[in-house]
Amino acid sequence: QAEKAEKKFELKGEAKHKFEKMIQDTPIDYILVSEEIIAYFKEHSTKALNDGIYVTLTDHIANTIERIRMGIDFDMTMLLNVKSLYREEYKLALHAIEMLRNAFHLHIDDNEANFITLHIVNAELTSNMMEIYTITSILESINTIVLQSFQVDVQDN
């Protein structure tokens, strides 16, 4: 017996168009696990998330699963401070990684949580992902200056 879709969310404009296209091109199991992860985020986050995350996170999950299955590794050094900059979101992202591991029986490195964290932050803000990367890069530069000038690591404080 097929499962009946029970969740409702509203996308408008470009996000709606992107989601409609994505549904045609994305395996249903990626969409379903993405919805489970987003439901977890919404239940455990102290901040509201816009529904655009259904498009961006599902697309990210699909690309991540395919990349891992093809054995393609990704350099995440530019995202090392995401954990300390967005602590709450990072914890949610780690749980999402565990959900993906369980759903797809793949080894997914915890570092992938950095990208998922940025998707959560993007959904909390009205900014786009490029602005989030820029903000994160600036904050990492500030952290480096503080570390070099005062020998104080603010990452874990």
Model-derived features with residue positions:
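A cross-family "folded-core" feature that marks the main globular domain of proteins
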Residues: 1-157
